[in-house]
Amino acid sequence: MKKSLTSLDLNLLLCLQLLMQERSVTKAAKRMNVTPSAVSKSLAKLRAWFDDPLFVNTPLGLAPTPLMVSMEQSLADWMQMGNQLLDKPHHQTPRGLKFELAAESPLMMIMFNSLSQQIYQRYPQATIKVRNWDYDSLEAITRGKVDIGFTGRESHPRSRELISLLPLAIDFEVLFSDLPWVWLQEDHPALREAWDLDTFLRYPHISICWEQSDTWALDDVLQEMGRKRHIALSLPGFEQSLFMAAQPGHTLIATAPRYCQHYNQLHQLPLVARPLPFDAQQREKLMVPFTLLWHKRNSHNPKIVWLRQAINTLCRRLI
C-alpha cells in the first residue's frame, strides 16, 4: 500500500541526504549538530519506511544499497528545490550562505581577491570555501559538496578529460580557451638557442600531477611524433611548477597555460614564455577549454546563477 508523505518526518530526508553525502553516521551527525545516536535512530526509521537497509557497513564506511543509489538524484533534487523555496520570499540578504568552489590554481588565485569582494559585498555574512581541483572534484559536485568547479579540460581525441566525456548530470560553460606555453627562467641557456622541438626536449621538464596522472595531452602529442620529454620533477600544480622554473641554479622548464602570465606578473616571477614548438594541427590537440562546471540540479539556483555570472565577468576582465 502506498504510504502518505504526511506520515513521514521530513527531517528524516535531510538526514538521509547527509548520510549519502558523508557515508558516515558520525559525520552526518556533526553536520546536523546532533548525536550519532540520534542519526542512528533516524536511519532505523528510514529503513522501516523504505523497507530496505539503505546502507550497509563496510571498512570504508557506509555503502548505499541499490535502492538508495536509485533515489540519490531524486533526493538531491528535492532538497535543492526546498532550499530554493526557502530562499525566495525574503528580500533580506540570506544569513550564513556558503559558497564552496573547486578551482584550478593559479586560475583562482588571479581572480579570488576580486571574486571574494563581490561575494561579501552581496552577501556580507557569507562564508567561502575553496579547494584545489582534483581527481574527485566532479564527484564532489555531484554529491553536493562543491557548488561550482572551474578548471581546464583537454582537447586531445584520446584524452579522458574531454568535455564530451563529462557525466550527464554535469552542466558546463566554456569561459575561454587557452594554449599551454613553455616557461623558462630569464637566463635559461635555451633562450640562446634556436627555439625548436630539439631544444624543447633537450632540457629537463617540470610536470604536474593532474587528476592522479603525471602525463597529459602534451605527452600524447609527443608520443605520436615518436618523441618523449624527460620529466625530472612532478609537482601538485601550475603555481609550484612556475615557482620552481623561476629559481636559479638549474635548467628545468615548465609548461603551463598562457593565462599564467597574469600570475607571473602578480608575483613578479623572472620567467620568459615561449610557444610550444608544434604545428597548428598539433597545437589544436593541446587547446585547453577552461570551463565552469555545476550540477544540473543547480542550473536555476539563484546563488549558483549569480556566482557563474560573477566569475564570467571577472574572466573577461582579468584573463
Swiss-Prot record:
CDD domains: PBP2_Nitroaromatics_like
InterPro entries on file: LysR-type_TF, LysR_subst-bd, Tscrpt_reg_HTH_LysR, Tscrpt_reg_YidZ, WH-like_DNA-bd_sf, WH_DNA-bd_sf, YidZ_PBP2
DNA-binding region: 25-44
One annotated GO molecular function: DNA-binding transcription factor activity
Domain HTH lysR-type: 8-65
Keywords: DNA-binding, Transcription, Transcription regulation
Transcription keyword on record: yes
Keyword Transcription among UniProt keywords: yes
Pfam families reported in the protein's UniProt record: HTH_1, LysR_substrate
Family: Belongs to the LysR transcriptional regulatory family.
HAMAP family named among the record's database cross-references: HTH_type_YidZ
Protein task: Involved in anaerobic NO protection.
Name used for this protein in its record: HTH-type transcriptional regulator YidZ
Top-level taxonomy: Bacteria, Pseudomonadati, Pseudomonadota, Gammaproteobacteria, Enterobacterales
